[in-house]
């Protein structure tokens, strides 16, 4: 009996150790990717933050982080993953908190281009077009050639640095006007597993 108790406690301890090791490995991977991101964008400062809550009334459209003006953050700052994937924008802020509106919200419009061709357009959340959890790249020239998995990146603006990854093209067509093309884009950021973000 005592031996069984000992073995059970030992097994529980080993399971805890494995969970801790897995968490440390994920953190280590995030930090390595952040180092790469900082090397690629040496002219920007990145502040890390953890997500403390998601807006329950939305489709991954907004979340709160536990950092704010007291940490040097400001409304309008871009938010990315450790891989340089665009998550969204700070839209409300307090001294020790901030609300991030994600790219899935169609109120955000981001100047973007198809990396392979350089054709530019505007990305916004595609929920109102019947594509929840997707993006839509609008206002592309009619002659634009689009291929599945073409990368869509930011063109650079006062809000978003150039070359950040928005996502990958899944589908395309002519828009409602019949004079421009659009593309449906799978976001690069995985909103289902997002825990930590970086503010640019």
Regions flagged by a language model, labelled:
Residues 1, 20-23, 30-200:
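A secondary-structure micro-motif
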Residues 1-13:
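N-terminal membrane-targeting segments
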